[in-house]
């Protein structure tokens, strides 16, 4: 660990157009902070994690290293996902303080001085950011995002804030806590809340990306949310169990109704349609329960194989520093 240094982790996937704009903006912020008395002694490093980009993002990262020794890059052997990219960046960061930022400038670099001030003067271990509006985002995505955060807050022990971004500044204690969680199926928004510590939240208006297109489709976000639920809650298993108990109670009640009607009124209950509906209903509940169990078992299977979270194709950093 290097004292008085801020490491900026920037996960990138096909961000060739946005990366130079991000670099210009973040260096402006660095220069401004270096001129202020409170932050004059800080040094910086920029860790660009190329997550298997196919548009020349790695070439741009290499160009930035030519004139700036503070720029580091890690290039994966293939696309491993943003979660892996963030984890790799945290492992290789040497700074006493570490920030995670997206390259599309949807995470305003101008907030960095205020975040650092909160760590130093107010005693926080991490400063997170959250969007107070979702301007420019499809309405249906905003609706489901809000519902997801509300649901996760109720069914899990991870403190998840609505509108929270991955953009945050953390001290070394907080970073080491995250690095101690070596699970393969990572859901960082949940992990940030699970580790606890003293966290301050700063709010900002939503900003559209400066270049390129979002890499997250609605379907990908849906699957990502399922991963989060499975990773941090047993609620789906409880729901499946409760559904099974309710089905059993309904079946017993129906059986008693048929027996009583036959014995008391001598009127047998007929009708194949009702029988088919009941069978389909119970079968649907069974398939749903099997699917829920399958999700949990598949995650256990991936964890049991103990494969690395990512593989590096090339980098100008010698080795990880997760034990700092």
Indicate where each model-derived feature is located.
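Residue-level signature of catalytic and energy-coupling elements of molecular machines
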Residues: 8, 26, 89, 104, ...
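Short conserved micro-motifs on helix faces and helix-strand junctions that flank
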Residues: 11, 76-78, 168, 241, ...
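Histidine kinase transmitter module recognition
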Residues: 11, 36, 49, 118, ...
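Acceptor/aglycone-binding surface of glycosyltransferases and processive sugar-polymer synthases
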Residues: 76-78, 82-92, 97, 109-191, ...
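Conserved amphipathic alpha-helical interaction elements at protein-protein interfaces in regulatory
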Residues: 28, 32, 63, 67, ...
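Structured catalytic core of nucleotide-sugar glycosyltransferases
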Residues: 1-136
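Residues in soluble alpha-helical coiled-coils and helical-bundle/repeat scaffolds
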Residues: 14-17, 106, 110, 179, ...
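Hydrophobic helical membrane-anchoring modules
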Residues: 1-4, 134, 187-324
């Amino acid at each position: 660990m290097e004292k008085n240094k801020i490491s900026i982790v920037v996960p990138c996937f096909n961000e060739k157009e946005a990366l130079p704009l991000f670099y210009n903006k973040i260096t402006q912020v660095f220069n401004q902070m270096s001129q202020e008395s409170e932050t004059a002694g800080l040094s910086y490093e920029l860790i660009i994690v190329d997550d298997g980009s196919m548009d020349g993002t790695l070439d741009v990262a290499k160009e930035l290293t030519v004139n700036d020794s503070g720029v580091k890059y890690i290039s994966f052997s293939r696309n491993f996902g943003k979660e892996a990219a963030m984890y790799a960046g945290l492992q290789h960061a040497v700074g006493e303080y570490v920030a995670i930022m997206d390259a599309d400038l949807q995470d305003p670099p101008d907030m960095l001085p205020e975040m650092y001030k909160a760590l130093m003067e107010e005693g926080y271990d991490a400063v997170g950011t959250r969007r107070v509006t979702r301007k420019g985002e499809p309405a249906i995505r905003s609706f489901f995002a809000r519902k997801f955060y509300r649901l996760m807050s109720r069914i899990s022990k991870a403190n998840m804030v609505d509108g929270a971004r991955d953009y945050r500044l953390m001290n070394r204690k907080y970073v080491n806590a995250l690095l101690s969680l070596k699970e393969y199926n990572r859901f960082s928004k949940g992990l940030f809340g699970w580790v606890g510590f003293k966290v301050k939240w700063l709010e900002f208006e939503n900003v559209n990306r400066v270049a390129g297109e979002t890499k997250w489709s609605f379907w990908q976000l849906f699957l990502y949310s399922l991963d989060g639920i499975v990773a941090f809650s047993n609620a789906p298993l409880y729901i499946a169990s409760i559904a099974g108990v309710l089905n059993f109670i309904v079946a017993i009640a129906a059986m008693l109704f048929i027996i009583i009607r036959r014995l008391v009124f001598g009127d047998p209950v007929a009708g194949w349609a009702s029988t088919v509906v009941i069978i389909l209903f119970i079968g649907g509940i069974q398939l749903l329960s099997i699917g829920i169990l399958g999700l949990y078992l598949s995650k256990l299977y991936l964890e049991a194989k103990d494969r690395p979270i990512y593989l590096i194709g090339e980098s100008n950093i010698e080795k990880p520093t997760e034990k700092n």
